[in-house]
């Protein structure tokens, strides 16, 4: 099984052995997450094509081959049945308050490794119809 081992750009690489498995068939170094090993957090299509629809996948270009970062998905997001706004996915760090389902996609900006992907102002706006008031 492909398991999480050494870190690469904030995400662990996939290697054989160990117990922190994310995707059994994952071969790309960016397709595993250190603390979230559920299927909904790491899509097989992410490893295969560089872009996966639905919860768990973002898109990132790579030289010499396809690379894909897995978007972080908070446990409470999964319980709510939703995940992250489309522009809040490219980050090499755990999600901030902004990246919860209460975040407003229009507030987000691109990010780089080690930086948060969203502005603090995102935190107090809602993007889901069921959200009636700020939660931060």
UniProtKB/Swiss-Prot annotation:
Coiled coil: none annotated. Keywords: Keratin, Repeat. Pfam families: Keratin_B2. Residues 21-130 are annotated as: 11 X 5 AA repeats of C-C-[AEQVR]-[ALPTV]-[AGHST]. InterPro entries: KAP. In the hair cortex, hair keratin intermediate filaments are embedded in an interfilamentous matrix, consisting of hair keratin-associated proteins (KRTAP), which are essential for the formation of a rigid and resistant hair shaft through their extensive disulfide bond cross-linking with abundant cysteine residues of hair keratins. The matrix proteins include the high-sulfur and high-glycine-tyrosine keratins. Interacts with hair keratins. This is Keratin-associated protein 9-3. It comes from Mus musculus.
